[in-house]
From Swiss-Prot:
The keyword Kinase does not apply. GO terms for biological process: translation. GO terms for cellular component: cytoplasm; ribonucleoprotein complex; ribosome. This is Large ribosomal subunit protein bL33B. Belongs to the bacterial ribosomal protein bL33 family. Keywords: Ribonucleoprotein, Ribosomal protein. Disulfide bonds: none annotated. GO terms for molecular function: structural constituent of ribosome. It comes from the Bacteria. The lineage of its organism: Bacteria, Bacillati, Bacillota, Bacilli, Lactobacillales. It comes from Streptococcus pyogenes serotype M1.
Amino acid sequence: MAQKKASLACVECGSRNYSIGVSSTPKPTRLEVNKFCKYCKTYTLHKETR
């Protein structure tokens, strides 16, 4: 199956900084990763949005 595009949004400011490819099969939980936010200028939690 093909991958769908999803983006990772910063929890602090809400900006969508990263885009990723995720499998099209549904998952019960969404991906959460600590990444650098260029607007907050710090490492923050980013959650998967569709």
